[in-house]
Curated annotation (Swiss-Prot):
Lineage of the organism: Bacteria, Pseudomonadati, Pseudomonadota, Gammaproteobacteria, Pseudomonadales
Keywords: Cell cycle, Cell division, Cell inner membrane, Cell membrane, Cell shape, Cell wall biogenesis/degradation, Glycosyltransferase, Membrane, Peptidoglycan synthesis, Transferase
Protein name: UDP-N-acetylglucosamine--N-acetylmuramyl-(pentapeptide) pyrophosphoryl-undecaprenol N-acetylglucosamine transferase
Stated family: Belongs to the glycosyltransferase 28 family. MurG subfamily.
Species assigned in the record: Pseudomonas savastanoi pv. phaseolicola (strain 1448A / Race 6) (Pseudomonas syringae pv. phaseolicola (strain 1448A / Race 6))
Cellular-component GO terms for this entry: plasma membrane
Underlying gene: murG
Function: Cell wall formation. Catalyzes the transfer of a GlcNAc subunit on undecaprenyl-pyrophosphoryl-MurNAc-pentapeptide (lipid intermediate I) to form undecaprenyl-pyrophosphoryl-MurNAc-(pentapeptide)GlcNAc (lipid intermediate II).
Length: 356
C-alpha cells in the first residue's frame, strides 16, 4: 500500500512505546510510517532504531516556566506550527495520529489546517494538556481508560497498546509449598522513595512469610538499594533495569510499583495483583486516577506515598501474603481488565477514518 501515516509522540516512554506498537502494526498492514518528535525526547533514540523516518520540531512545555519563557511562548508555538505544517505537506499522510507529548499540539493543529484526519490516543486516566486541546477537533478520540474524555460519537475506549508477549500467559506455579515472589519496580522516575521503603518494610515481616524479592532500582540506584537490603538482613536481587519485563511479570506473584499508564496496562495484561504508590507530584495527579482503575475493581491496593511508611507497607504486605486466595482473586480481576487487542483497535480506528 502506497500510503503514509504520521505518528506524533515525544518525551517519555509512556507516549513513545504505545506509538511504536501501533507503528509496527501500520507497517504490517503496508503503510509507511513517519514520526514527528522533538530534539530532546526518548524518540530520538527509539524511533531510528525501529527504522522509522523521524521529523523534528522545536517545542517545549510551558507548565511551571518563568515569565520570560511564557512571553516567548507564542513565538515558539508559531514556529513549531510552521515546522509541523512543512512536515505534513512533505509527508502527505492519510492520517495523523497523536499519542501525547509537547509535539502533538503544533502537529495536531497542522493536521487540522491541512485538512488531514487527526486521531489522538490518551494513555492516562486524565487527559494531558495537548490531547485536551485537540479533542474538540480530532476526528476520533481514543482513550486507554473509560470516561477519560466526555461522551461523544468520536470517543473509542481502546486500552493501551502494550508488548504482545505479556499476553502469552504462562501459568504461575501454585503458591502452596513455596515462598511468594515480590517484584518491586522502582523505575527511574521517583524511584528513591520505593528504594528506601521496601527494605525497611520487608524487614518487619515474620520470617515465615518473607517473599523472594526482585527489585528494579532505577539507573545508578542499584548499589545503594542492595546495601539497604543487606543492612536489614533481607535477601533480594537488585537490578538497575529489567531487560525482559515479560519474564519478570511471569515470575512474580505480587508487584509494588508506581502507577504510570503503561504499568497499569501491563499489570492487567500479565494478570498481576499490585500495591500501587502513585507518584505524588505527577501532572494533574494522573497516577492516582490510573491506580484507581485497578483498585476500584479489586485488582490492586492504592497506598499514597504521603501516608505509607514502613509499618503501613509491612502491614499490607503481611495481609496479602498470608492470603494466597486473595492474591489469586486479584490476579484474575487484573487479567479481566486487560485489553489484548488495543494495538489493533487503535490502528483499525485510524484506518477507518483515513479511508472512510
Amino acid at each position: 500500500m502506497d500510503a503514509n501515516v504520521l505518528i506524533m509522540a515525544g518525551g517519555t516512554g509512556g507516549h513513545v512505546f504505545p506509538a511504536l506498537a501501533c507503528a509496527r502494526e501500520f507497517q504490517a498492514r503496508g503503510y509507511k510510517v513517519h514520526w514527528l518528535g522533538t530534539p530532546r525526547g526518548i524518540e530520538n533514540e527509539l524511533v531510528p532504531q525501529a527504522g522509522l523516518t523521524l521529523h523534528l520540531i522545536n517545542v517545549t512545555g510551558l507548565r511551571g516556566k518563568g515569565r520570560l519563557s511564557l512571553l516567548k511562548a507564542p513565538f515558539m508555538l508559531l514556529k513549531a506550527l510552521m515546522q509541523a505544517r512543512k512536515v505534513v505537506r512533505q509527508v502527505k499522510p492519510v492520517c495523523v495520529v497523536g499519542f501525547g507529548g509537547y509535539v502533538t499540539g503544533p502537529g495536531g493543529l497542522a493536521a487540522k489546517l491541512a485538512g488531514v484526519p487527526l486521531i489522538i490516543h490518551e494513555q492516562n486516566a486524565v487527559a494531558g494538556t495537548a490531547n485536551r486541546s485537540l479533542a474538540s477537533f480530532a476526528s476520533r478520540v481514543c482513550e486507554a481508560f473509560p470516561n477519560t474524555f466526555a461522551a461523544s460519537s468520536k470517543r473509542r475506549t481502546t486500552g493501551n497498546p502494550v508488548r504482545v508477549e505479556l499476553f502469552l500467559e504462562t501459568p504461575r506455579q501454585a503458591l502452596t509449598g513455596r515462598k511468594a515472589r515480590l517484584l518491586v519496580l522502582g523505575g527511574s522516575l521517583g524511584a528513591e522513595p520505593l528504594n528506601k521503603l521496601l527494605p525497611e518494610a520487608l524487614a518487619r515481616l515474620p520470617q515465615d512469610i518473607q517473599p523472594e524479592v526482585f527489585h528494579q532500582s532505577g539507573k545508578n540506584h542499584d548499589a545503594v538499594t542492595a546495601e539497604r537490603y543487606r543492612n536489614v538482613g533481607v535477601e533480594a536481587q537488585v537490578a538497575p533495569f529489567i531487560q525482559n519485563m515479560a519474564q519478570a511479570y511471569s515470575w512474580a506473584d505480587l508487584v509494588v510499583c508506581r502507577a504510570g499508564a503503561l504499568t497499569i496496562s501491563e499489570l492487567a495484561a500479565a494478570g498481576l495483583p499490585s500495591l500501587l504508590i502513585p507518584l505524588p507530584h505527577a501532572i494533574d495527579d494522573h497516577q492516582s486516577r490510573n491506580a484507581d482503575y485497578l483498585a476500584r475493581e479489586g485488582a490492586a491496593f492504592v497506598m499514597p506515598q504521603a501516608t505509607t511508611g514502613a509499618a503501613e507497607m509491612a502491614a499490607r504486605l503481611k495481609e496479602v501474603l498470608m492470603q494466597p486466595e486473595q492474591l489469586n482473586s486479584m490476579a484474575r480481576t487484573a487479567r479481566s481488565l486487560a485489553k489484548p487487542d488495543a494495538t489493533n483497535t487503535v490502528v483499525n480506528v485510524c484506518v477507518e477514518v483515513a479511508h472512510g
